Amino acid sequence: MNEFLPDSCLLGVMLAVSSHSGPQVIYHYPPSNRILETARDAHMNQQLGTTGLKRETEGRSMKSRGHPGNWDMNSELDSDLHSSKMERTASSSSSSSLSSPSSGLSDSELSTDYADWSTSGSSSDSELDLQTPDDSRRSQLENAGARSTRNVSPVSMSRNTSLGREPKDNGQKISASKLLDILNDPKSQFTKINTNDTNDDQFNMEEDDDLIEFDYMTSEKRVDITEEFFTEANYQDTSKFFEFDIDFLAELCCPSREMCNTRFELTVDEYCFLGHPIHVDSSGNWRKSRKRNNSLSKSKRSGSLTGSRKRSGSKSSNHDKSFSAETPNSPESSKIIEEVGSLHKSRTLSNPQNDHFTKDMTMFHVCFIMDPNLIEYNKRVDDMYQYVVARLSVLLRYLQSKNDYVSEQCELILKEKEKVFKNSKHYKSLSLPSEKGRYLYQRLLAKSSLARALTECVEKIKKNEIACLEITDHRTVSLQIPIQNEFSILPQYKLYPVLKGSFLTSIQNNKFLEKSANIDDNHHAKSARDTNLISDHVNTFSNGQTKNEIFYSKNMENALTAQNDYDDDDLLLYSILLLDDPDKIIADLDNYSSNDDIGGVILKQLVKVIQPNVPLLSYQYIINELLAEKPLSSSTTANKSKQNKDNKTNTFYSALLRSCALHLIYWRHARAILPISFKNTYIVSPLSPVEADNSEMIKGNRKPSITDLNVTSNSSSKIPVIYLNQQSFKLKFPSLPSLPTFLNILSLGKPKAFGNIIPSKEHKPIYMAALIWLIQKGYLTQLLTFVYIRVDKKIKMKVDEDLEKEGFRTNRRRRQEDNVDNKLLSTDENANEPPKSTKVDINDNTLEGRDTEYDSDSFDYDDPEFNHDYTIILEPERATALEKRWIYKCIQDQPQDIKILFNKVMKYMNGRTAMETVMLKEHISRHDIKRLLTSLGNYIVELNHW
């Protein structure tokens, strides 16, 4: 059982939609044959002898559930069948490539638009060198459209193609509408040569345009696919997805409305289909708007931002207008643009039914395919749904309700498929199915932002990395499955493997992220009053804030509320420990934020100056300097309005610092720890990577992936990590003892403060750097102090005596009152009775009443706890009346300053809150805490734990 090891068990993703014409699969990834992949993966695992992980082939191979030995015959048989299939496909493709000299079309191209698109032809992927068009044609088109290609976003550029359906046959085909355009050309009635030249120019123009755009997207690194999926051995026909027909999966993953808008989980054989299908309601809305007026106003504002992209959509022929606006006004370029625009216009008008695709779509479903082990099934599937599936589906539903994003992207993908299958000469020139498939997927990824997002999501999550998906130009979402690399309780790592180098500490970083997520759900109304302040600052300081998800106004509202509701454990009281070099972290921040983003600027500056021995709250001056504002005024002479403004600004700066820290923690760049000090006590962690090798080690404790966990065949991978780190430690700190010796010094004798091993003051800087390095690598963990209140039998007896004294005085008053009442209410029937017996009855009734009163006050002397020699108070803040008397009796004879200090700290003496944390929360010095614990003496129980 490997629950603690990072393994998403993710295989692929599929986008299925349902419209009036029925369900269909729009996009799926990867197009790979899983049997061949798992056979190679099993062989690799058998060769390397790995037991902890099943996914150790550079993060791209998929694990096998069967025995490695059973795959040899099946994989060989499947390889033979696949190779024979490719030979038949290649021969048919080569035979169909002969075109007629009269019309430029082969017999197989004379087809109709009503071909079955649901079962696609075999298009494969392998290593492919893209063939560029002639230099003359390329230079001619670059003069006309290179500038437009650079400036127009890939989504807006790709919405001008026509919707098409994937043909069933493998041969080259051309749609009937395109054939009619050629035959109806007036020039074709007079001269056959002019007709061929004109149409060839149009097709070449379109092909050049697509290739230039594709080259641009490749240079911008927006097209990134795994080459292993597109080899001849691993490639699988696009009509199948993990051994299932596409039509079958379309019916399977498009449930009825009653089963939509909730969790979708279906197991077929060893595969688990997990998703969250989104269906329109009875009124045709994708989601219910809580505030219709606000949503309408927001939609108007968003319409102004996305209007240019929508106006350049596929429903009109405005592509040539926007294209020509960015190009020089030369006759040659204008002629080329007119030809391209007319071709796009004719293709768009030839398929009028495509314009209704957006209105016809009633459901979409992003379905992920997994293969978890049976013993880990619940955990793997639940984590995948909670952290990836649900969040991505909700975001796509929001975008679909706002601007029909999903339906437009689906239409765009279908159009691009038809364009590649019917019009791409480069696609037809390829012989192998794997090469065709690779080219097809590259074109789809270059055109569709949704296809890129789904592909990147699969690639990153499979490698246990963070997937930063740029859905649109204004929407970015980060998805990840958190790795288990921190523990508050020592796990049974011999039975259940864990990542070596994990952190063993009570300071759990996940709780800060969970609190931020809980604020999203529970405190929208409470933070609404600060929305105007936040929006004003964001609009003033940042124009590119959408490039970084942590600086959305929504998250800033949440950060403002965190200090009010979680003041007992504020993130600003902790320090930030960077887990990698600052230069690498800044380089990563540059990839996901723009230069003018105020959030990115603050983050970069914070990474440069941050130190793990300084609380995060001390870095507020960075924001003041970057925003060029004067220090906040706190003078008593300032008026009330100015003080309120300063308080709001200070709250905003604190929220911004908190957001920066959460960003670094979420992206695994840093950890929140207690400020490092020489007065703290540090011990060697039981989870330190002393006996681990490279396969069990988190490299730098940063962004672990399957690549990091991979075991190579080199002998160096089996060397314990401590010997590898010993060299780095020696190079970094040459004047210190070796790493094993240094750890041995910390392990000898009783744990003591780290400053006791420093020989002199001159050695403090280098010892501080060594301490930070050891904590980064997971070798050391801080030993914390936890306290319980202990009440012994003497305190209980004193409290018992006090209660008896108070109870005696109460009985005396009640006895007198009862005597008076009984004398007034005496009857003739009781007049003959002696007074003595009357007193006895009164006393008995009084005692019963006293017992009843004390029972109501929870003073139960028959409680077994009362008779024990001592009692530990687990919750001092919620102690009973009797327990409170015990507690205050313990400090009755203490000085007044000790009593005041005890009242501050008493609620934290529950055995769960470290005294080192109390020092930060209550601003109490270490000396005062030590004096308090010494004064209480035997009345406390002190525990040392991580």
Swiss-Prot record:
InterPro entries: HTH_NPRL3 (IPR056603), Npr3 (IPR005365). Residues 287-301 have a biased composition (Basic residues). Residues 79-88, 836-849 have a biased composition (Basic and acidic residues). The gene is NPR3. Residues 146-163, 324-333 have a biased composition (Polar residues). GO terms for biological process: cellular response to amino acid starvation; cellular response to nitrogen starvation; meiotic cell cycle; negative regulation of small GTPase mediated signal transduction; negative regulation of TORC1 signaling; positive regulation of autophagy; pseudohyphal growth; regulation of autophagosome assembly. Mediates inactivation of the TORC1 complex in response to amino acid starvation. Required for meiotic nuclear division. The keyword Secreted does not apply. Residues 91-125 have a biased composition (Low complexity). Residues 1-21 form the signal peptide. Belongs to the NPR3 family. One of its GO terms (cellular component) is GATOR1 complex. This is Nitrogen permease regulator 3. Keywords: Meiosis, Signal. Residues 48-171, 283-334, 813-849 are annotated as: Disordered. The lineage of its organism: Eukaryota, Fungi, Dikarya, Ascomycota, Saccharomycotina.
